């Protein structure tokens, strides 16, 4: 029996019609092979012979697959027909071809065989008989004998079935698809006619031109010769007087007009049928093209588009060319239809183009038609010109409006980026430039210029002569940096973006790389606002000596720690960092060389010296040096003054040193502090507390971060949780804006409570401030209900050395906790009316002040880094009892000299009855009566500062808010 699946057949009995059938084998998997239709004679022979012995049949209608007889077909054989040929079984039963599934019908006709027609037309007699025999359920009796030729043909066909066809044979069997000729316009007669007409028209035009030239020469000769014949003169004047009206009616003019119209129509005709002409030429060269051809019309349009896009003056040149062509063609037409000269005709053509009303004076049909045509073209040309001019003006104005023009400035301050600190930063820069009559600040950000100007216009302060210029662009693109004259700026400030810390610092690093790539170099230094302290070394490594970094997030955290331990310090920092009052300045005074620092300290009536920039140590700034330090040549003095031109050294005043009060060393007491929220740099804040607090202190951390996650984050930050010696960490989980969660905490027992801007909502300053204010109100309300039943704190808090009424007023009988709330938006702080100074709302305004100060003088960054660090010198608040006695009369210079015995520099004071501290007071030599309720602001060494901070803990009254919640 034959197995025809997959294009193979196994003959039995040597290919004869007789023999015992082979044992049945399971059908092989069908193979995806192409089919080939066998000729009708072979198929009919197979039908006549193969039905006699179905088990030994090997021939099929298609060489790749043989249909099994109905009796021998295995049951369950899946067969799917592509189509329904005329010779298929009507019921689609066992006689259905099992090869037809290989090629789906929805893919179109098979390349190797034509699809059989669906119509029920009669095939030839032999084919119909064979199909009828194959469809009959009862096999017909086979012939007794078979001719030798038939057997040979059957063997050859069997060999074809068994042997897989090669690729070349399959290609030969597949008829080529019929060529589909695209419909085209036959240009042969039209092209010949067009060429003939063109040649004739051109010849007639030349002949007419020559004839008109000869006629003009005759007219000129008639006008110049006095003996000319009267008749000739009359005819000449007649021709000139009629302005060509007789010439219009002549056959010559008609031929010239027709030829001119045909000449103008030729380009239009070529543009319309150029593709058909090109296709005809290519078809004559090659009959069949395998590559896709682009029409010439599209090619021309593409070239024109590239030309207009790549050349800035392409539109203007095209308009100029069109105008020249219009004037030239119009001049030629006027020259033909009128009796004027060629140059005169060109001039008339130009006047018709320039002014559409000039053609009204023309006489005669020909000149009028030509003049109207020229005027119409002129109106089109001028309309196009107006459109181009309007587009150019609009594009230029739009470029100015969008901030794409170049900034031509020198010694300006350049701000790269946009953030919520920009408003307060511009305010501080405007105040700093007030003394010089104002300056220029350029802002480059990836925002629309109009939006930036609108936001800056909403700021409620006067710029005092400082102009702010906004430009839209990316700080990462060198072209945009050159647009704002980055190489000529005296200072560049890179603001942190509103993204998370790592993304913001990564962007700042890319901006620094862009700045270092400026070929012209940078004249000023670069101040970079960083978000994470760990990324600071990388930025400094890339930028080099020009880079000054201000780690905003860490600065806020450390300031909050200092303000929690010393309430009132935030206001003092605002006075020093802001340009409205006193600030840091560094300047060299040669007349002070050789003087001791103790004498330099009292040499400035309008400033307070607090450090020295040592020239011999590569410009290192030494804060709070010893009294015996002698200024060398090149050393500069660091002072706190109103402005850089408001102080000069003077002669030494007379001071009374007196005796320093003998205050016993107070003991240090443990503190209990609560952190509400989670910050990225909370590990740094914990280390600052570890350095400041006494042993046995507790730090409660209340937030929504799981305890294991907290330990992991603290460990990743580089902190040894089990290595803390002074503080003990207490973890509590909860939401700081849910009252039920807050009531589970002993809020009345905490000495200080810090409400942190939560890390989960720090990207939105509005949400962060809302959470902070809600937490502050809830804590105050819970404390007010619990504190009356609470006993007073230990009398150790009220030892004899703390007599300030300002401090006693904040300590109060109920001993309320100090609450420091972190507010990111300065506008939110304006909604809160703070009672006294304890519950101070800290905002990003301090960071903006630090950025502005470092931008004005990069050396100040060394001072701020030391004052913000947990080591070195820091700013503190001291009670007057450490420097004077009750009602003692002293000058400010006397107190400065006494403070030197404690290695401190007094920079200001606050009287008992005042709400504002005075930094760098005037009239320092004036003697006044002091009270023990007064306090002084000093710069002290880290050891002394930590010691005295613990003895002057301040407490506050309840906070009063002006807004209603």
Swiss-Prot record:
One of its GO terms (biological process) is monoatomic ion transmembrane transport. Pfam families: Castor_Poll_mid (PF06241), Slo-like_RCK (PF22614). The chain crosses the membrane at residues 187-207, 251-271, 317-337, 369-389. It is a multi-pass membrane protein. Residues 410-551, 670-818 form the RCK N-terminal domain. Expressed in roots, leaves, stems and panicles. Keywords: Ion channel, Ion transport, Membrane, Nucleus, Transmembrane, Transmembrane helix, Transport. It is found in: Nucleus membrane. The keyword ATP-binding does not apply. Its main location: nucleus. GO terms for cellular component: nuclear membrane. Residues 32-42 have a biased composition (Polar residues). Disruption phenotype: Defective in mycorrhizal symbiosis. Induction: Not induced by mycorrhizal colonization. Residues 1-76, 108-158 are annotated as: Disordered. Residues 1-11, 52-66, 118-149 have a biased composition (Low complexity). InterPro entries: CASTOR/POLLUX/SYM8-like (IPR044849), CASTOR/POLLUX/SYM8_dom (IPR010420), NAD(P)-bd_dom_sf (IPR036291), RCK_N (IPR003148). Required for mycorrhizal symbiosis. Belongs to the castor/pollux (TC 1.A.1.23) family. Can restore nodulation but not rhizobial infection to a Medicago truncatula dmi1 mutant, but cannot restore mycorrhizal or rhizobial symbiosis in a Ljpollux mutant of Lotus japonicus. This is Probable ion channel POLLUX. It comes from Oryza sativa subsp. japonica.
